[in-house]
């Protein structure tokens, strides 16, 4: 009888390990708050994460829809076996005004007062910096991070690119807005890192909103021209066949993967 018992025990161990692996793979992004700043963010660790090695970090900026959990989940599902720690901060610079009443935020009145007094971009930038400090300390994230976002996320992403290129490993913008918000030519970064920073714009070939002559396409072109005029020499545009106006999470993560190999 011993042999069948050992077989049953072995089967139970295998099933338990398989279930644990499946649970980790399908685990939803977790909502957290930075330890030194009130900004909140969704965290998703990669499959096989361990604290004994360094991991690349992708900061996902949501569009003006402000469906932060949807964005976090979309990138987590697209990640597959790629080694990225995914961070989706609840930023406030990704679109127009009136965001205080958006139900996907979870900030207390005191936090909203802080946003108003410090300014939206200062809140977001200081917040992302605080998040990265936590991610480096608690989850072995790398010092620099990748950043990506669709449409109105461009306001935030371009703001980071033009003010803090030294913090980034690369940026991906999908049909991005750009109106010069949070960017002042007198104070924008002159860090040498900007010259080689990889900045890629993505447009779905079937995206009818992001075609020549449309406002958002013109904004994207203006941002690229502004970047090149201010010493950013690694700015590119790529079209993705078969895709429309969408996050292009898989394409973005594939691009970032190409930068770490």
Q: What kind of region is each of these model predictions?
A:
Residues 159-169:
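Conserved hydrolase catalytic core segment
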């Amino acid at each position: 009888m011993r042999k069948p018992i050992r077989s049953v025990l072995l089967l139970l161990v295998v099933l338990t390990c398989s279930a644990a692996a499946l649970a980790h793979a399908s685990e939803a992004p977790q909502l957290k708050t930075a330890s030194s700043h009130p900004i909140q963010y969704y965290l998703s660790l990669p499959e096989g994460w361990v604290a004994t090695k360094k991991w690349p970090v992708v900061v996902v900026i949501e569009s003006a829809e402000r469906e932060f959990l949807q964005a976090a989940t979309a990138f987590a599902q697209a990640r597959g076996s790629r080694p990225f720690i995914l961070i989706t901060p609840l930023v406030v610079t990704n679109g127009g005004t009136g965001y205080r009443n958006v139900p996907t935020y979870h900030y207390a009145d005191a936090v909203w007062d802080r946003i108003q007094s410090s300014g939206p971009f200062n809140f977001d930038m200081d917040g992302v910096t605080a998040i990265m400090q936590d991610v480096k300390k608690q989850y072995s994230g790398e010092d620099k991070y990748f950043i990506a976002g669709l449409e109105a996320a461009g306001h935030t992403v371009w703001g980071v690119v033009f003010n803090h290129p030294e913090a980034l490993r690369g940026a991906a913008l999908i049909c991005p807005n750009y109106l010069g918000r949070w960017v002042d030519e007198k104070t924008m970064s002159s860090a040498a890192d900007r010259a080689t920073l990889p900045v890629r714009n993505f447009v779905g070939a079937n995206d009818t909103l992001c075609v020549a002559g449309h406002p958002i396409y013109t904004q994207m072109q203006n941002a690229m021209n502004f970047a090149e005029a201010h010493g950013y020499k690694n700015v590119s545009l790529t079209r993705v066949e078969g895709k429309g106006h969408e996050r292009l999470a898989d394409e973005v993560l594939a691009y970032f993967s190409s930068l770490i190999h």
